[in-house]
Regions:
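N-terminal signal-anchor transmembrane helix specifying type II single-pass membrane topology
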Residues: 2-59
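Peripheral, non-catalytic regulatory segments
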Residues: 74-252
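GT-A fold catalytic core of metal-dependent nucleotide-sugar glycosyltransferases
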Residues: 207-210, 341-391, 755
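Acidic donor-binding segment of Leloir-type glycosyltransferases
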Residues: 283, 288-320
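Active-site-proximal specificity loops/subdomain of glycosyltransferases
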Residues: 310-351
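Catalytic core and acceptor-binding pocket of nucleotide-sugar-dependent glycosyltransferases
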Residues: 377, 385, 389-394, 399-520
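C-terminal catalytic/acceptor-binding lobe
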Residues: 454-647, 880-896
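Contiguous segments within soluble domain cores/interaction surfaces
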Residues: 652-753, 757-762, 766-896
Length: 898
């Protein structure tokens, strides 16, 4: 009996041991088969010796650097998805091939024009043929006798002290000596090593001879090539990549020979900040330097205003060929190269070209920059991301094909970068020598021809092109890892994927410097940094004034309106002026309101054409808008400027316990997530605007959820949003899901805590007097003023007290709204004026009378005295030396502002 029990116990124990061992070895096999790929190495490298410089990348690149899969492009392909199918019935052409790329098919469906759709199809088909991109390019940076692929031996490695410690990757199915060599060449390392079959290492230093062991100790087959061996257990086959150890040049700090230098300032301008452009030119101008100015093709106002500079100054030229330079677009690199070719053809003699935008400003005197560059003639200044090239390629999207059309960068598929060259990149702000620029512009080498094809289809191409050419050309020994710039990166604010509307990618943008960032600029005093970005006077002008003082500008005490800033919103000479229906409707109503106020003073004026509209700020506080328009006064043709400002419409329930936590609760449009402001300062909204609710809570508020209700002018709930209040979400925005056109009239937005109304704000959707530049007709009114109530969600069950009107009141509001939206002509204008009076206040008027020879003489109209605009401090026509191009001092070669 006892013997039988022992046999049974032995039998079950034996089975248990076999089961445990089977499970153990199965787990090992699973771990080997699913060993992390290159995309997972980011996390593995935390325990290995490497040179992951994410902070360096964060300092210079416009790409998101957050760890983890925070972007759609970070996610692995979902192979289980159904195959994408091209909807050929939407095309008016026959595709030349079967488009296989899911990304290309998505881009074709989203593109608006048939031209763009066909361009994407044709380019995708060329790439699918396999001969579009060069497979290999030559690296012309040969400074030693190293040979690509030469095996230098088998070496014993150590876990805590790796032979090659600069990069580590694990490639379970692909690894081979050639595969690892290509990766190390791409990253710019002199040595490549394979180990344990699947592992690839790169390094800068040759392994010590004391670690060399017999070749037979490296005996594991390579998964990517069974005819090759890939090291062994802590044994490594080491190969030369053919490259030398790359060491950027260290620039000199002092100019020994004292020779002068000539700089081409390549200004690439966008937007409407004309006065800031003048301020930048005033600071940099010397008669021995050159200014070559490219203005975005869409910026008619800026180009028109700056055209006169060519006649005033022989060393200033405007680019005759203009590009639409969207964020991240391939057109940016085309523009830079075209500009460089153009000023080379002009025959200018120069020593450096430095590209700047209207958002750049010098943080050292021009003389300091001249001395520094003079001491380092021939060197090329670019800023690199760091050494983790594989991550940079992935995060920058260099392994993707992009195509620009319809001012959009479409992602259309994957690609493999050519073998044989080192990939580098970082910032697109550079300082380049004439020899290097000429080498690029001539473009005779196969390297340049190949890179041209690659970067024509690359996101943010200027952030990598110049760096990559430098690293792989005869100019590799002129590379300086410094672009002379300090950039105000605030990743939590600047990396909000705010460019998704122009590019199929998540991008980052630096923040504007404000006075609270002053320490960052002060810290550059003893560093080789000469420019900072970004600066926007519409955001913060005080910091620019402080920087001018910092670099030695000493005329501020002579400028009366030093703290004032004006920026154009509208100009009648703009090519798009006639189609700005909302702004023209709004401005027309404001000047009619002003004429009625003047009429009460016995001043009758006949209104004429609206000429210009400016935004006005003083001491970095928005003070309103200024409308410049023609008028007939006392029988004379004059120009009047009217100053007005939006009213505040915030009602708070002081019985609510959380009301004290609310700092901001208002609606606007053109919300800038990075700067946390509405770019539409005046809150001018029409039926086709995209309203956004901005809210801000104090840091002492309680956590929890709040409800936001949107009520249209007819008393109907249009949308409901839930917002969270916590310490990490103090300032945020809500965009309602309401289709165009929005119903014109007075809208309300309510904030609720459960059923308690906490705050209410109002905003105006102005009816349109014009449509496509012409007065609206009966038929057009029915289209643009009818609203989109049929698309609202069913929210009839939500009826909070003191917000949604009762049934009878709601029916009356609906009846009034239906009557209003049918108005045209004078009846429509009366409705518009009635609404605008509730939302805007007139603050003053001034006059510009060409017949009046005395600038300080007032003009009497009835009982109203008009001051001349030229002596009215708030007027856009008042003198602004800091925002006007100065006069040339022939003795110093500088521009004097006053």
């Amino acid at each position: 009996m006892v013997l039988n029990i022992r046999r049974i116990i032995y039998k079950y124990a034996k089975c248990l041991i076999i089961t445990v061992l089977t499970i153990f070895f199965a787990q090992i096999l699973i771990s080997i088969n699913y060993f992390p790929s290159i995309h997972e190495n980011i996390f593995l490298r935390k325990n290995s010796h490497n040179s992951l410089h994410l902070n360096n990348l964060a300092d210079v690149s416009a790409r998101r650097i957050n760890p983890g899969n925070s972007d759609d492009e970070d996610l692995a392909p979902r192979n289980h998805q159904n195959k994408a199918v091209l909807r050929k019935e939407e095309l008016d052409f026959i595709p030349v091939c079967e488009v296989k790329s899911r990304e290309a098919i998505s881009a074709i469906h989203r593109a608006k024009s048939q031209f763009c759709k066909q361009l994407i199809v044709n380019k995708t088909c060329l790439i699918q043929n396999g001969n579009f991109y060069p497979q290999e390019l030559n690296n012309d940076c040969k400074l030693n006798a190293k040979i690509f692929g030469r095996h230098i031996g088998c070496y014993l490695d150590e876990k805590k002290l790796r032979l090659l410690s600069s990069f580590y990757g694990n490639y379970a199915n692909l690894n081979s000596p050639l595969y690892c060599l290509d990766i190390c060449v791409q990253a710019g390392f002199p040595y490549a090593g394979v180990q344990y079959g699947t592992e690839c290492f790169c390094g800068e230093e040759s392994p010590p001879e004391t670690s060399k062991i017999p070749d037979k100790s490296c005996d594991m087959k390579c998964p990517g090539d069974n005819n090759q061996v890939c090291g062994g257990y802590f044994t490594m086959n080491v190969y030369e990549t053919g490259l030398h150890k790359f060491i950027p040049q260290t620039p000199e700090t002092k100019n020994q020979d004292g020779k002068s230098i000539r700089i081409v300032f390549l200004l690439t301008l966008n937007g409407r900040a004309l006065r800031q452009v003048y301020r930048l030119i005033n600071t940099l101008y010397r008669k021995n330097h050159y200014f070559y100015i490219h203005i975005d093709k869409r910026q008619d106002y800026l180009h028109r205003e700056l055209s006169s500079l060519e006649k005033q100054f022989p060393n200033i030229r405007l680019a005759p060929v203009r590009f639409s330079t969207i964020w991240g677009g391939a057109s940016l690199l085309k523009m830079l190269l075209n500009c460089m070719k153009d000023f080379i053809d002009l025959g200018w003699e120069w020593d450096y070209v430095i590209n700047l935008s209207e958002s750049d400003f010098p943080i050292k005197s021009l003389e300091e920059l001249e001395n520094f560059l003079s001491a380092n003639k021939g060197l090329n200044f670019v800023k690199s991301h760091g050494r983790e090239v594989q991550r940079f390629i992935k995060k920058q999207g260099l392994d993707k094909t992009f195509l620009e059309c319809e001012t959009h960068m479409w992602r259309i598929g994957e690609r493999k970068l050519p073998r044989g060259i080192t990939i580098d990149g970082g910032s697109d702000w550079v300082a380049l020598s004439p020899d290097f620029v000429s080498y690029i512009i001539e473009g005779k080498q196969d390297l340049l021809k190949g890179l041209e094809i690659i970067f024509e289809h690359t996101l943010l191409p200027a952030e990598s092109f110049f760096h990559t050419v430098l690293r792989n050309s005869k100019f590799c020994n002129t590379y300086v890892d410094n672009n002379l710039h300090v950039t105000n990166w605030k990743r939590k604010l600047g990396c909000k994927c705010q460019y998704k509307h122009v590019v199929d990618w998540c991008g980052c943008s630096p923040n504007d410097f404000r006075t609270e960032d002053w320490a960052k600029i002060q810290n550059t005093l003893n560093r080789q940094l000469f420019f900072a970005r970004k600066f926007e006077p519409i955001i913060n002008q005080e910091i620019i004034t402080r920087v001018e003082q910092f670099i030695g500008v000493n005329d501020h005490y002579l400028i009366n309106n030093l703290e004032a800033y004006w920026q154009s919103i509208y100009d009648t000479n703009d090519l798009t002026a006639s189609s700005d229906d909302t702004i023209l409707t709004h401005a027309g109503s404001i000047i009619r309101q002003n004429s009625k106020i003047l009429a009460t003073e016995g001043c009758d004026i006949k209104l004429g054409e609206i000429l210009e509209i400016h935004l006005y700020k003083y001491a970095d506080v928005y003070k309103g808008n200024l409308i410049l328009h023609k008028a007939v006064l006392n029988g004379l043709n004059v120009v009047i400027e009217t100053w007005y400002k939006p009213k505040q419409h915030l009602e708070l329930n002081f019985n609510s316990p959380i009301v004290d936590y609310i700092k901001t609760f208002r609606v606007g449009s053109d919300y800038d997530q990075k700067e946390m402001i509405f770019r539409n300062f005046g809150g001018i909204l029409g039926p086709f605007s995209d309203p956004v609710l901005l809210y801000q809570f104090s840091s002492h508020k309680q956590s929890g959820n709040l409800t936001v209700l949107w009520l249209d002018p007819a008393g109907m709930l249009a949308d409901v949003n839930i917002i969270s209040r916590d310490e990490n979400n103090l300032t945020n925005f809500v965009k309602p899901n309401i289709r165009h056109p929005l119903l014109p009239g007075l809208w309300k937005v309510g904030l609720f805590e459960q059923t308690t109304l906490v705050a209410v704000t109002k905003f105006l959707i102005t009816p349109l007097e014009y449509f496509s530049g012409k007065e609206v007709s009966h038929q057009e009114v029915g289209l643009i003023h009818s609203g989109s109530q049929n698309s609202y969600r069913n929210l009839t069950n939500i009826k909070p007290l003191k917000f949604v009107p009762a049934k009878e009141e709601s029916l009356l509001m609906e009846e009034v709204s239906n009557s209003n939206i049918k108005r045209i002509g004078n009846d429509l204008r009366e409705w518009i004026d009635m609404l605008n009076i509730e939302f805007y206040s007139i603050l003053g008027s001034c006059i510009n009378d060409s017949k009046n020879t005395q600038e300080s003489e007032k003009v009497l109209c009835g009982n109203y005295h008009f001051n001349p605009c030229t002596v009215t401090e708030w007027s856009s026509l008042s003198p602004d030396p800091k925002g006007s191009v100065g006069k040339l001092d022939i003795h110093t070669g500088r521009l004097k502002r006053v």
